[in-house]
Amino acid sequence: MSTEPTAGTIVLIHGFWVTPRSWEHWIARYESRGYRVIAPAYPGFEVEVEALNADPSPIEALTVPAIVDHLSAVVEEVDSPPILMGHSAGGAFVQLLLDRGYGSAGVAINSAPTEGVAVVPLSQVRAAFPVLKNPANRHRAVGFTHDQWHYAFTNTFSEEESLALYERYHVPASGSIFWGSALANIHPGKDDTYVDYHNDDRAPLLFISGSEDHLMPPKIQRSNAKHYKSNTITEVKEYEGRAHLLPAQDGWQEVADYALEWAEGHAESR
């Protein structure tokens, strides 16, 4: 078992098209506050960004159950329930983990939706088009060009900033998972991203949304939050002028501090 620092543990879960490297600023900030910070990689993502771009075959093999089982195993190794934070697809995985009973509080940042959230803004269609335009992408790892990345992730960043972050963070994403998510609401039965929206035992959950996010716009965050009908705490916080890659955008410190303060306050009430 792990040795727990006085301040506790925070688990940061990355999304698609990036790796744990995308949390580098938040890791340093939270560690400076006395927290143990774990930023687990998806199965096969234990290598660097450059290696995944050179050989994306581990990405092609990804499944949602494999990712969530892996994350569950990571969280189970922590001595007391950690704070869970996730960005994009990582936000959906935070919701799935909370539904399984893990975590003292959860923060979902520009989160991908869980099953049943059927809102599809036009900006999301355009942002996801590189993956969805070709059904053959269901069996591939699909990357973005820089122009596509700039629209989907960094539309409020300068061109220079966007390119630097593209080169530092970008990796292909699983076409299979993305297609599965797109079709989830028309398939019968429970999908891989199913959660029990009436689960009264779930830890408090905060959705953080960037007002200018093209890939997972605020409308999705609000709709996802409204799906929860349990007696547990579910709140939404929106930041003006923020894009999808909120954890790396100028002013990220304000968001990181708010997320932590909210989680600390609501975790203590459990």
Question: Model-found features: residue ranges?
Answer:
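Active-site glycine-rich loops that stabilize anionic/oxyanionic intermediates
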Residues: 15-18, 88, 211-212
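Conserved alpha/beta-hydrolase
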Residues: 31-53
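Flexible "cap/lid" loop of the alpha/beta hydrolase fold
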Residues: 103-139, 179-186
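Helix-rich cap/lid subdomain of alpha/beta-hydrolase
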Residues: 124-172, 176
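Short beta-strand/loop motif that positions the catalytic acidic residue
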Residues: 201, 207-209, 213
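Conserved alpha/beta-hydrolase "acid-adjacent" motif
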Residues: 214-223
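Catalytic active-site module of serine/aspartate enzymes centered on a nucleophile-bearing elbow/loop
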Residues: 233-270
